[in-house]
């Protein structure tokens, strides 16, 4: 019985929410292992929509859900999201939700710093959600973060906050901002401590025990591999590692526990925020994809940039994340197009290349090299078997498999979880 890592293979927004929900019914434990509440996803169950950005998707199924140490946790958002789910009739208790005691916290100073940097006229605009994710990770690697476990030790919390503010207040002075008092942060933390502490645990131990007992573990990735801090389109990336390897480091369960990596892949390409996007379409086709695909961010509401499927970046992600198979989503959005293009390579300074270069300058200069395939007039929406798909749609899917070097394990044809074609069960050894 394999444990499964779900990772976005593009720039996020690939439709991971539905696939994770589909898989969570087969899983015993669902784990968030990176990111924060900056990337949202929507689950539709029995006609009810659940919008999550921090809590694992398994909660709506009553499965044990874990927030790993690789996640940065905004405690106030945590409480608000828990209460929102309870308001929708979901039972959220420590029996079904655990938070890593060594997870770092996002504080108000992180959110304010994030917004100040992004709103500045100087420097590079990355397109962050301004939710404090980046500054919180900075404090983590700077060894000055306040972690969840620190809330259990009030006697040592003050000196930790003092050390944290020694850094942040120096930044604030340089930006012309008023300094933050220690009492302000202490009050912020103590006001929410009683509401988050019942959920904390040594999640590495919990996961190890469940694995040894034969539980199926699903690792739920956020965002996409092209936003990875190392392997993405740097500096237009997020502040954590989003490739599949982070599932081990961000949960405390060793890499040998990972059995199958499923890459969630949209049948076309989208991106939110700034950064290179070789196949972006600023024309009526781009508008068609955005409108039909409802391409607006769950967290920010920002309109997503849209373009043709880019086999180069997905092929690269297949390698950097060790993807065994992909779940191809939103195929139905392409219904009705007379022809469909796929980017098979790039041209860089007159030369053909089959990879996305690392430098920002080169990424901005690459030009897509396309193959054109005939589209289809029939609908794929709601298809639940290969026989339900138009012949040209099947050819499109098969060609994607050839180009990226990975098979399609699942195919999604609508937001409804039942409209899914299963080719390979990721949980099956």
UniProtKB/Swiss-Prot annotation:
Gene Ontology annotations for the cellular component aspect, listed alphabetically: cytoplasm
One function term, GO molecular function aspect: GTP binding
Positions bound to Mg(2+): 13, 40
Keyword hit for Cytoplasm: yes
Annotated SMART domains: Adenylsucc_synt (SM00788)
Subcellular location: Cytoplasm
Example GO biological process: IMP metabolic process
Cofactor: how bound: Binds 1 Mg(2+) ion per subunit.
Cofactor or coenzyme needed: Mg(2+)
Residues annotated as catalytic: 13 (proton acceptor), 41 (proton donor)
Primary localization: cytoplasm
Biological function: Plays an important role in the de novo pathway of purine nucleotide biosynthesis. Catalyzes the first committed step in the biosynthesis of AMP from IMP.
Summary of subunit composition and partner proteins: Homodimer.
Record's protein name: Adenylosuccinate synthetase
